[in-house]
Every structure is written in C-alpha cells, then in structure tokens.
C-alpha cells in the first residue's frame, strides 16, 4: 500500500456505507484536482455499479486504496490530519497546508474513536442551530473545495 507522502489532499474515508455518497465524494475529489483516497475496512465497494455511476468513473483517475488500516496510515503520514465533526474551528477559517489528510466518517456513527484520537485537529462546518448535520457527500465537497480554494484556484488566477 501507499505510505509515502505524496503531495496534495489525502482523503481518508472511515466506514462509508452508501455507494451514492462514495461516488459523489470521489467525483468531487477528482474534480478539485486531488488524487489520493483511502477507504477503511467496512467501506462500500469502490467498484460497485452504483459507486461507478455516482462517481462518473472518476475512480479510474484517482489513486484509491481499499481495506486500509487508517490508523496505521495516519501514523505514517508526515503532515497534518484533520477530522470533521460537530465541534471545532470552522473549516472556513482554517488556513491549510498544501499537503493534508482529512478523515470523513460513517453516515450514522461518524468517525471511529480510534481515528478521532489520531487526528491532529477536529474541524466543523458552520450551520444554523436547527440543522443537526450534513450528508457526508455534501460535507466532503465543502472541505475539498475549501482546500482547493486556498491552493489550486489561487495559483490559477
């Protein structure tokens, strides 16, 4: 498996169950110019027809690893690892380094406690009070494009 420290935004997906969500996340990740995706044991199948349909086949342009031990991967990465949850600094206020990893969790349970402990910082997406949470695909899009806004799009202006 890939354990070097390639450049860019590394997406770590913890037990994502819905193929539609996974497809949307992959499509967004590729659209923002990113390459690396790591799926934990328990994630839905990267190659299922519904994931391929939802991603529009973008997993063919990504470097994807399935059945990964994300805790071991985090131990080997040499850059910041963020998690997304309900508490923490707003992702919109955080100045990112170009090379980061971001953990997104299961649709119902969120990120496992093991991975939360390994995260350098939890960030949140600001929402009005009567909205409990966002769909993981929507949340991923916000995080991915905030990182892209700070690097990819600034460099191309």
What do the PLM-derived regions correspond to, one by one?
Residues 71-74, 78, 93, 117, ...:
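Compositionally biased amphipathic helical and low-complexity segments enriched in hydrophobic
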Residues 30-32, 43-60, 113-157:
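Structured adenosyl-cofactor binding patch, chiefly the S-adenosyl-L-methionine
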Residues 35-39, 61-65, 87-90, 106-110, ...:
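Glycine-rich loops and low-complexity Gly/Arg-rich segments
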Residues 4-5, 11, 49, 62, ...:
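Intrinsically disordered, low-complexity regions enriched in small/polar residues
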Residues 16, 25, 37, 52, ...:
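Weak global preference for isoleucine
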Residues 82-131:
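Active-site/ligand-binding-proximal alpha/beta "capping" segment
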């Amino acid at each position: 498996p890939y354990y070097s420290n390639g450049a860019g935004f590394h997406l770590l997906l913890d037990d994502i169950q819905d193929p539609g969500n996974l497809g949307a996340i992959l499509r967004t990740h590729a659209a923002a110019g990113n390459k690396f995706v790591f799926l934990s044991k328990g994630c839905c199948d990267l190659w299922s027809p519904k994931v391929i349909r939802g991603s529009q086949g973008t997993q063919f342009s990504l470097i994807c690893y399935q059945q990964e031990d994300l805790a071991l991967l985090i131990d080997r990465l040499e850059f910041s690892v963020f998690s997304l949850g309900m508490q923490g600094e707003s992702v919109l206020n955080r100045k990112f380094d170009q090379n980061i990893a971001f953990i997104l969790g299961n649709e119902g349970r969120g990120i496992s406690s093991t991975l939360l402990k390994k995260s350098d910082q939890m960030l949140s997406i600001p929402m009005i009070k009567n909205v409990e949470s966002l769909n993981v695909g929507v949340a991923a899009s916000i995080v991915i494009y905030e990182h892209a806004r700070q690097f990819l799009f600034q460099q191309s202006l």
